[in-house]
């Protein structure tokens, strides 16, 4: 049974996954030769990858400002959330940034530590742009399913204070987490 307090770790959460799910997750994260590991070793490999500061940087960069605020509110232990935050809680839970119970969530202590090391001025500048491209990509997928780059550029450049060229959009896109 998972202990639900601020001492909970990402390992504790991922240990609840079955081995096949962990192998698929690890593969999505770029890990290889996962079949040879026992479950605890596999959990640790995935945890190490998720807590890697570069991985944390790019995974966190797709989060909206609201999602980041919700995440950080859970740093000090179990925190309640509103119905309006349910979608954000779902996203953060799917990305394994948080652990959710019926009406509360908590951020694993090792995620808090890695997040605090990751969130700096460089991250915030990149996150502002990457989260916008992510939001636009999500919208274009819903509207068109497949979007040519010239149309995608028109969509992302709709904000007057934030302009992108094709190379930057592709660079940002190439860093989006494959598991999400």
Feature names for model-found ranges:
Residues 54-62, 110-143:
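Short, amphipathic alpha-helical interaction segments positioned at domain boundaries
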Residues 88-97, 159-180:
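Charge-enriched amphipathic alpha-helical scaffolds
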Residues 39-43, 153, 166-174:
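Short, well-structured alpha-helical segments
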Residues 12, 32, 61, 79-82, ...:
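Short, charged/polar micro-motifs that form catalytic or ligand-binding hotspots
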Residues 1-115:
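Basic helix-extension-helix modules of the SAP/HeH family
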Residues 26-27, 151-160:
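DNA-recognition alpha helix
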Residues 70-72, 135-138, 154-158:
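Core catalytic DNA strand-manipulation module of type IA topoisomerases
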